[in-house]
From Swiss-Prot:
Major subcellular location class: plastid
EC number, as in UniProt: 1.97.1.12
Keywords, sorted A to Z: 4Fe-4S, Chlorophyll, Chloroplast, Chromophore, Electron transport, Iron, Iron-sulfur, Magnesium, Membrane, Metal-binding, Oxidoreductase, Photosynthesis, Photosystem I, Plastid, Thylakoid, Transmembrane, Transmembrane helix, Transport
Official protein name in the record: Photosystem I P700 chlorophyll a apoprotein A2
Record text on subunit structure and interactions: The PsaA/B heterodimer binds the P700 chlorophyll special pair and subsequent electron acceptors. PSI consists of a core antenna complex that captures photons, and an electron transfer chain that converts photonic excitation into a charge separation. The eukaryotic PSI reaction center is composed of at least 11 subunits.
GO-annotated biological processes: photosynthesis
Function as written in the Swiss-Prot or TrEMBL entry: PsaA and PsaB bind P700, the primary electron donor of photosystem I (PSI), as well as the electron acceptors A0, A1 and FX. PSI is a plastocyanin-ferredoxin oxidoreductase, converting photonic excitation into a charge separation, which transfers an electron from the donor P700 chlorophyll pair to the spectroscopically characterized acceptors A0, A1, FX, FA and FB in turn. Oxidized P700 is reduced on the lumenal side of the thylakoid membrane by plastocyanin.
Lineage: Eukaryota, Viridiplantae, Streptophyta, Zygnematophyceae, Zygnematophycidae
Top EC category: oxidoreductase
């Protein structure tokens, strides 16, 4: 008999219903639950899959480079980055009539194309690429790297090349290699690329495979390095009149600390970026020699953790027992990694616009908006994932004996206090913020706007002033002419920084007022509520007063049967599921805020945000409704335009989003009846009844239907906002 899907679970493979297919897909990556899995095979499978992931990433980035080189306008864009629209790739669509062909033929192309809003043009230009040949070379190189990654993944599944479990659990060696090798050496290599290729290219000197070994990046070569006169590398920086990519106004410095932005490109100075990466490299290469491995020198992580016992004994055993708990739990490690990655991704969103690293990115408003929104959504999904795997850790891997009275055990002991404090913070933020918004709404509706309650964010303004923003008139730290901090930095980074922070033409420390105060607290409400749901889900994953034996039921269960009331919807999976809605809701507010504030700044109309953002009707009318007009006009009586595709995506996104509710609100019985009715009709219809299922059709389980509903809700929500964001921004700024 041929083996049926899924091969990894004989129990499921023998299921006579369509449940076999859905549960098979749902558990395909839950290696721990598969038949005949051993700890060794588990680690090896995950290790090999990492190479597969890398292969996919390199293939994808190779495709980006290839399509821009083949169908884009990279060389034309490089000659005039502010006026030529960058092309991502051509569009071939047999449905296009003449109006569509004309609408989508842009950027100097001969046929319909997509415009790139990803920032790759700015990135490739900044790092020294200038020709299509450069792009093709990069695409080919990444294709080769992708192939190597695939072979490596296959190789590490072969008997001779399978690493042992002890190798995977050698935490000190892994940390040393990742710190020194992954972060340290790659940062050093990137510094090398910036100094040897990107900086000379930014000064109009072409560096290629033919001359990079013979062209020193600094007139004095390595002499200052070996003679200890490192400051020579910072002398003669590019002038403020430097034209990027040309010799005009170019200097010779390679490692600087200028602060602020290049006046023409509005991006960070390349020589500052190189200096930053060099510092990071030194730091991480040193850090990668910290932990004790073969030579008996350096720190032992186990000893460090075991020594972390709070004094006076009032706070338990501190970090004792954590080494084995973390080292033996893949879910704990994944939770930590996801939490870190989530924070970093959100930081990328924040820094991409406030300190733009790529030349001319600051002038490409749609790309800035797209990059901010993209990174914030990714961060949200990654962070919720951290808590999901934290909850799975508590269910599958946590050992109370190993963790007696340490920090993990005490978290569980104090969970009521933790959860109730979070709940109190969420309630306080929610009622007060909504109360202020609604009060202001009513005052506007009654024609007495002067009766609004408007609170200046004085603490935030004070912090901005401390960093040198002089607008608010606080006489503090870098806003105080007599401050020692001010005089100490005058010779290096401060003048550039102070120019930038007090310039009205960038997004560094935006001017804030009562509208910002309110939306900040709305976002704080969203963050605290999301965290409340996630933390409660993880801390109650093993059991609660209502259901002390919860961990016996696993991560996701719908209920414990009809005979035990109150056990529905309380699995750790359900907490994750609910938290994702709150996460999406919160990031909605974050991106609305960012986008509207920037639209008004870019249009030179900051007063609109300041005046309309203090009441809900202002957000609905002056942000959402006003900026959706381009989308609504994508199709009109006069034909179509280049925003039509976004208008269609806006509608399609709403459709997908609404479909989610069909799964979220109607449950198994409804679907089971519907399916049985359809099957009955099918079996009694001539011709149709010649086709039979092997599996008996059954409705999705409650948990699965929720997942399908959540997936549609999330995808529809993001599609809708992406279309709105790109159309409303590109419609205004071209």
């Amino acid at each position: 008999m041929a083996s049926r899907f899924p091969k990894f679970s004989q129990g499921l493979a023998q299921d006579p219903t369509t449940r076999r297919i859905w549960f098979g897909i749902a558990t395909a990556h839950d290696f721990e639950s598969h038949d005949d899995i051993t700890e060794e095979r588990l680690y090896q499978k995950i290790f090999a899959s990492h190479f597969g992931q890398l292969a996919v990433i390199f293939l994808w980035t190779s495709g980006n480079l290839f399509h821009v080189a083949w169908q884009g306008n990279f060389e034309a864009w490089g000659k005039d980055p502010l006026h030529v629209r960058p092309i991502a790739h051509a569009i071939w669509d047999p449905h296009f009539g003449q109006p569509a062909v004309e609408a989508f033929t842009r950027g100097g192309a001969s046929g319909p194309v997509n415009i790139a809003y990803s920032g790759v043009y700015q990135w490739w230009y900044t790092i020294g690429m200038r020709t299509n040949q450069d792009l093709y070379t990069g695409a080919l190189f990444l294709l080769a790297v992708s192939a190597v990654a695939l072979v490596a993944g296959w190789l590490h599944l072969q008997p001779k090349w399978k690493p042992s479990v002890s190798w995977f659990k050698n935490a000190e060696s892994r940390l040393n290699h990742h710190l020194s090798g992954l972060f340290g050496v790659s940062s050093l290599a990137w510094t090398g690329h910036l100094v040897h290729v990107a900086i000379p290219e930014s000064r109009g000197q072409h560096i290629g495979w033919d001359n990079f070994l013979t062209t020193p990046p600094h007139p004095q070569g390595l002499t200052p390095f070996f003679s200890g006169q490192w400051s020579v590398y910072a002398q003669d920086a590019d002038s403020s009149g430097h034209l990027f990519g040309t010799t005009e106004g170019a200097g010779t410095a390679i490692l600087t600390f200028l602060g602020g932005f290049h006046p023409q490109t509005q991006s960070l100075w390349l020589t500052d970026i190189a200096h930053h990466h060099l510092a990071i490299a030194v730091l991480f290469i040193v850090a990668g020699h910290m932990y004790r491995t073969n030579f008996g020198i350096g720190h032992s992580i186990r000893e460090i953790l075991d020594a972390h016992v709070p004094p006076a004994g009032r706070l338990g055993r501190g970090h004792q027992g954590l080494y084995d708990t973390i080292n033996n739990s893949l879910h704990f490690q994944l939770g930590l990694a996801l939490a870190s990655l989530g924070v970093i991704t959100s930081l990328v969103a924040q820094h991409m616009y406030s300190l733009p690293p790529y030349a001319f990115l600051a002038q490409d408003f749609t790309t800035q908006a797209a990059l901010y929104t993209h990174h914030q959504y990714i961060a949200g999904f990654i962070m919720t994932g951290a808590f999901a795997h934290g909850a799975i850790f508590f269910i599958r891997d946590y050992n109370p004996e190993q963790n007696k009275s340490n920090v993990l055990a005490r978290m569980l002991e104090h969970k009521e206090a933790i959860i109730s404090h979070l709940s109190w913070a969420s309630l306080f933020l929610g009622f007060h913020t909504l109360g202020l918004y609604v009060h202001n709404d009513v005052m506007l509706a009654f024609g007495t706007p002067e009766k609004q309650i408007l609170i200046e964010p004085v603490f935030a303004q004070w912090i901005q002033s401390a960093h040198g923003k002089s607008l608010y008139g606080f006489d503090v730290l870098l806003s105080n002419a007599a401050s020692p901090a001010l005089s100490a930095g005058q010779s290096i980074w401060l003048p550039g920084w102070l120019d930038a922070i007090n310039s009205g033409s960038n997004s560094l420390f935006l001017t804030i007022g009562p509208g910002d105060f309110l939306v900040h607290h709305a976002i704080a409400l969203g963050l605290h509520t999301t965290t409340l749901i996630l933390v409660k889900g993880a801390l109650d994953a093993r059991g609660s007063k209502l259901m002390p034996d919860k961990k016996e039921f696993g991560f996701s269960f719908p209920c414990d049967g009809p005979g035990r009331g109150g056990t529905c919807d309380i699995s750790a999976w359900d907490a994750f599921y609910l938290a994702v809605f709150w996460m999406l809701n919160t990031i909605g507010w974050v991106t609305f805020y960012w986008h509207w504030k920037h639209l008004t700044l870019w249009q030179g109309n900051a007063a609109q945000f300041a005046e309309s953002s203090t009441y809900l009707m202002g957000w609905l009318r002056d942000y959402l409704w006003l900026n959706s007009s381009q989308l609504i006009n994508g199709y009109n009586p006069f034909g179509m335009n280049s925003l039509s595709v976004w208008a269609w995506m806006f509608l399609f996104g709403h459709l997908v989003w609404a479909t989610g509710f069909m799964f979220l609100i109607s449950w198994r019985g409804y679907w089971q009846e519907l399916i049985e009715t359809l099957a009955w009709a099918h079996e009694r219809t001539p011709l149709a009844n010649l086709v039979r299922w092997k599996d008996k059709p059954v409705a999705l389980s409650i948990v699965q239907a929720r997942l399908v509903g959540l997936a549609h809700f999330s995808v529809g929500y993001i599609f809708t906002y992406a279309a709105f964001l790109i159309a409303s921004t590109s419609g205004k700024f071209g």
